[in-house]
């Protein structure tokens, strides 16, 4: 049987809501030293518990229909944090475009304790201050993960806000943006005139295509105010820190929704009642 989206009724609004973020994190504690070691796994996801107000039967019928058509956890619906339906930022268009400015599948990097990353090529030629890069393949795990660029020193060198471990000529490193595991987005404005900020606490919806009406594939919370680099006669470049980590790569050119972003949700129980 095909899985389909069932549109949620829009009224009345919920009288109470609790919004939660779930992670899969393993932890071990040494019985001898008390030292802890954690391992974060791929799973991340939102959940919500909501309460509707009392309503007359004519209105409640719409919700009953919706609940039954979901068929337990079989079908899905679009949903967002009921207490944050309008973003606080001033960005003045409905969506942004995903565009990686750094994307290298294999390169040699040198990491220094002054928090600089040196490449043996020119991979940072298009990077801008505020960009988030995602590194994998470094021998020292401290150097892997998402790093925010604070200075573009040269086409082959950047300074990041993270604390790095010293490593020389670390080969087979990947330096990418908008990929699975990253906690930051590399974007550009949707038009040459679009501008404005994306605020901490705003939500963004990663969409499945370059259409503003396409189905979302992940809902993200903004954790650092956006950085915007003006482009004369072109689309401004925008960088923003987000959580949770991306569950999948974002295709270049696909849209990230700013106005009324939503995620995909399912019922947690196969029993519905009223």
Predicted regions mapped to residue ranges:
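Extracellular structured ligand-interaction cores
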Residues: 45-47, 201, 217-220
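Oligomerization/assembly interface segments of phage tail-like spikes and tubes
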Residues: 37-58, 269, 274
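Residue-level signal for secondary-structure boundary sites
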Residues: 56-60, 85, 230
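Long, polar/Ser/Thr-enriched low-complexity segments
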Residues: 12-49
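Small/polar beta-strand repeat architecture
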Residues: 3-11, 18-19, 89, 94-129, ...
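A glycine-rich, hydrophobic loop/mini-helix early in the fold
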Residues: 64-100, 178-182
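Extended, solvent-exposed, turn-rich assembly/linker loops in the middle of proteins
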Residues: 185-189, 197-207
């Amino acid at each position: 049987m095909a899985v389909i989206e069932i549109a949620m009724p829009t009224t009345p609004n919920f009288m109470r809501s609790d919004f939660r973020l779930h992670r899969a994190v393993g932890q071990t504690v040494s019985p001898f030293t008390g030292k802890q070691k954690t391992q974060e796994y791929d799973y991340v996801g939102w959940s919500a518990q909501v309460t509707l107000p009392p309503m007359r039967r004519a209105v409640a019928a719409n919700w009953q229909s919706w609940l039954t058509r979901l068929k337990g956890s079989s079908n899905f619906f679009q949903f967002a944090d009921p207490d944050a339906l309008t973003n606080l930022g001033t960005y003045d268009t409905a969506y942004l475009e995903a565009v990686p400015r750094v994307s290298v599948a294999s390169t040699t990097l040198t990491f220094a304790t002054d928090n600089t990353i040196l490449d043996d090529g020119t991979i940072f030629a298009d990077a801008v201050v505020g960009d988030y890069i995602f590194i994998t393949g470094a021998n020292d795990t401290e150097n892997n993960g998402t790093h925010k660029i604070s200075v573009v020193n040269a086409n082959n060198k950047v300074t990041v806000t993270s604390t790095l471990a010293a490593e020389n000529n670390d080969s087979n490193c990947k330096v990418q943006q908008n990929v699975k595991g990253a906690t930051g987005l590399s974007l550009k404005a949707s038009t040459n005139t679009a501008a404005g900020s994306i605020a901490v606490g705003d939500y963004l919806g990663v969409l499945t295509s370059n259409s503003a009406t396409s189905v979302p594939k992940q809902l993200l919370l903004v954790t650092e105010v956006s950085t915007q680099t003006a482009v004369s006669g072109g689309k401004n470049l925008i960088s923003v820190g987000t959580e949770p980590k991306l569950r999948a790569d974002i295709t270049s050119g696909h849209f990230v929704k700013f106005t009324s972003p939503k995620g995909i949700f399912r019922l947690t129980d196969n029993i519905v009642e009223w």
